[in-house]
Regions:
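Short, hydrophobic beta-strand segments
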Residues: 116-118, 188-193, 234-238, 249-260, ...
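Conserved phosphate/anionic-ligand binding catalytic regions in large, soluble enzymes, centered on
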Residues: 30-32, 40, 125-143, 341-364, ...
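Mobile "lid/hinge" segments at catalytic clefts and subdomain interfaces of large enzymes
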Residues: 143-262, 460-557
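Single-stranded RNA-binding regions, centering on S1/OB-family and related RNA-binding modules
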Residues: 564-566, 573-713
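Flexible, glycine/charged-enriched surface loops at secondary-structure junctions
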Residues: 106-112, 147-149, 216-234, 287-297, ...
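Glycine-rich, flexible beta-strand/loop modules in the N-terminal catalytic cores of phosphate-handling
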Residues: 16, 28-113, 118-125, 184, ...
């Protein structure tokens, strides 16, 4: 018997989105299918029955999976399986996580996993915002204490019109590609890649998105009611009032003093001293005291948790009431900046960007087209010629930590800095190199992704990449309290990120925005505050760009001597197979002989990448020889390879030779060819005839001075 299903439909951007539950994955707490066109996802939510012991964070796990079968393909690779999550899948997982995480009550420790699986993809209707909608629906059905629902929509502007959930083709045409997520009355998350759009363009898109988000939220509320969902009422079972009183009594003044001294080292030492006194006070309590019991029962360090809450309260009060930040800055002030370029001797381009106690080393490397990244995914894009990698080692924050591959955070930060600089890059026609930039965090105290954006831009310029402009970035924060005007902070440091209500990153040049990422820790941001944050971010960005220009103002005129050189030539398309040879034999021979990298496009454009001019010249000559086709009237320099009584055979290239009849060697009549022409001589000949059998007749005496001049030119 087919199970009973419940569903609802929405109209988003002129397309119908259908959400259905009841048929699949009945062992989950909530499971839905989401479909738009022929793009369909299964989204599942599982909630543990008991809270996890011994953790001080909310254990939410989001996994987004793309199946190659969704586009009718078998995965590449030896095992023909999907393997580990791609960067794209990680970015979508983060996209789902970020607007959901703030909407769970403090102290909730039950494990929640959301799995979004893409099973069908029409390569028109993009799956990421559908996965976000599905995750919210699954949570609403799960009964978990989720303070949603949320809606999510992508917005692009095509021909002056804003479009909700555009197709890939529409988004590619647009200067604006923005994803907005939020509740029925506020924005929680924004993610954007732009081509120098204004702050007003961003606000217009956000306000447009909110109308679509409200529709999604209202539909989900009705959907949950129709499914008879009873939401769990979560009340934090652990009363820490007495512990708060102890901290207030023992440590309040010390914390206050620590935050009013703007030396970071002094503050850390003072806070450690205060925390030690609190712990001693707690340890002196009777063994059967309630505080000892809840710490033993849960494994949670409530002392550290409540101490951090006391820090947060004092730091936020300083900003809200005094207008002073933890390092003494005003809300709109940027930390001191210094930069340098060309710091790595053999790198093609390098830069160090330092802002306060955040320091980034960015290194640019240039390579030929053959080093482009092949994308074996479900999206229409198949390759990348610009890549940015963000590396965050433990030593940057003074910690001992093993060096591993990039985690989700590193992938997200690297992608943001990559998107920030892409609009400033030249086209492949203008600059045919593949470019990779690595940004190593040498020291971290907040805003490392924005430091990577700035460092990358300067490294590209130092490498001689003809970028359109310099790109800078700034991270904004916000402090809120009910009944008070929110304070927007420019260039947040680590503690303001950790204890604040917003992390809002904006990148661009003097005129417009290239990338944007906003995450709220509070339950949303009002539009007027968002508008103010964008305006304040522009002021900060312009200041940062001014500091960067003190070091470098334009791309280097010449590439590094250690960078490869690129040259191009065009061959007839019918000769591509000849140059490649059977099984690639011929092109491998060219690569082995020249040491150059050869890339041949379907149009016949051949790109030769070599570390020296000699290698490039060898490759060019070999390709020219292979594609050589003599024509009547063509003047060629060749070598005499054989002599017979009636003439001399001259090698023309490409495995072809022709014969100079004895009568075509000298102006006067001669009886013997030698000594006029000898084997091994280089001679200039002109093609005078090609017969039906392809035999080539040449002349030496018919070559004029004008012919020789053209050949030498």
């Amino acid at each position: 018997m087919v199970p009973e299903t419940k569903s609802f439909q929405l109209e988003i951007g002129g397309k119908t989105v259908t959400v259905e539950t009841g048929k699949y994955a009945q062992s989950t707490n909530g499971s839905v299918t989401v479909r738009c066109g022929d793009t369909m996802l299964f989204v599942h939510c599982v909630v543990s029955k008991e809270p996890r012991v011994g953790i001080d964070f909310f254990p939410l796990l989001i996994d987004y999976e793309e199946r190659m079968s969704s586009i009718g393909r078998i995965p590449g690779g030896y095992n023909r399986s999907e393997g580990k999550a791609s960067d794209k899948a990680i970015l979508v997982s983060r996209l789902i996580d970020r607007p959901i995480r703030p909407l769970f009550p403090k102290g909730y420790r039950n494990d929640i996993q959301i799995v979004a699986q893409l099973f069908s993809y029409d390569q028109q209707n993009q799956p990421d915002t559908l996965a976000m909608l599905g995750a919210s629906c699954a949570l609403m059905l799960s009964g978990a204490p989720f303070e949603g629902p949320i809606g999510a929509v992508r917005v692009s502007k095509v021909d002056g019109q804003l479009i909700a959930n555009p197709t890939h083709q529409q988004a590619d045409k647009s200067d604006l590609d923005i994803v907005v997520a939020g509740t029925h009355d506020s924005v929680i998350m924004v993610e954007a890649g732009c081509k120098f759009v204004t702050e007003d363009d961003i606000m217009e898109a956000v306000e447009f998105a909110q109308g679509e988000i409200r529709k999604q939220c209202e539909a989900q509320v009705e959907f949950a009611k129709a499914c008879g969902v009873v939401k769990e009422e979560f009340v934090n079972p652990y009363d820490t009032t007495e512990l708060k009183n102890i901290i207030n009594e023992v440590a309040h003044d010390m914390i206050f003093d620590a935050y009013h001294n703007f030396d970071r080292k002094y503050r850390q030492e003072k806070l450690e001293e205060a925390k030690k006194l609190v712990k001693e006070k707690v340890e002196a309590l009777p063994e059967d005291h309630y505080i000892h019991k809840i710490i033993e029962e849960t494994g949670i360090d409530f002392v550290a948790e409540e101490f951090k809450a006391a820090e947060k309260k004092i730091m936020r009060a300083m900003i809200l009431d005094e207008g002073v930040r933890a390092d003494g800055r005003k809300p709109t002030e940027v930390r001191p900046i210094w930069c340098e370029v060309g710091v790595i001797p053999r790198a093609h381009g390098s830069a160090v960007f330092t802002r306060g106690q955040t320091q980034i080393l960015s290194v640019a490397t240039l390579a030929g087209p053959g080093m482009k990244q092949e994308l074996d995914g479900v999206d229409p894009e198949t390759e990348k010629t610009y890549m940015h990698k963000y590396i965050f080692p433990g030593f940057s924050v003074g910690e001992v930590k093993p060096l591993r591959g990039p985690g989700r955070r590193e992938v997200g930060h690297g992608n943001l800095a990559e998107r920030a600089n892409v609009p400033a890059l030249p086209s492949q026609e203008e600059f045919g190199y593949t470019i990779r930039v690595t940004s190593d965090v040498l020291e971290s105290n907040g805003s490392t992704s924005m430091g990577s954006t700035c460092g990358s831009s300067m490294a590209l310029m130092n490498a001689g990449v003809p970028v359109k402009c310099m790109i800078g970035g700034v991270a904004m924060g916000m402090i809120t309290e009910e009944g008070k005007e929110p304070v927007v902070l420019t260039d947040i440091q680590g503690i303001e990120d950790f204890l604040g209500d917003m992390d809002f990153k904006v990148t661009g040049n003097d005129d417009g925005i290239t990338a944007l990422q906003m995450d709220m820790k509070a339950k949303g941001i009002a539009n007027d505050t968002l508008r103010r944050a964008l305006a304040q971010a522009k002021e900060g960005r312009l200041h940062i760009l001014g500091e960067m220009r003190k070091v470098i103002t334009e791309p280097a005129k010449q590439l590094s001597p250690f960078a490869p050189s690129i040259s191009t030539m065009t061959i007839p398309t019918e000769d591509i197979g000849t140059v490649i040879g059977p099984g690639g034999k011929q092109i491998r021979a060219i690569i082995d002989a020249s040491g150059a990298e050869i890339d041949i496009q379907d149009s016949g454009v051949v790109t030769i990448t070599s570390n020296d001019q000699e290698g490039a010249a060898i490759a060019k000559k070999m390709i020219k020889d292979l594609t050589f086709k003599p024509e009547v009237g063509m003047v060629i320099k060749g070598k005499v390879v054989r002599i017979i009584p009636i003439g001399a055979f001259v090698e023309l290239g490409g495995g072809k030779d022709g014969m100079v009849h004895i009568s075509q060697i000298c102006q006067e009549r001669i009886e013997t060819i030698e000594p006029h022409v000898n084997i091994g001589d280089e001679v200039i000949v002109k093609v005078i005839k090609i017969d039906d059998k392809g035999r080539i007749n040449l002349t030496i005496k018919g070559v004029t001075e004008e012919d020789k001049a053209k050949l030498n030119a």
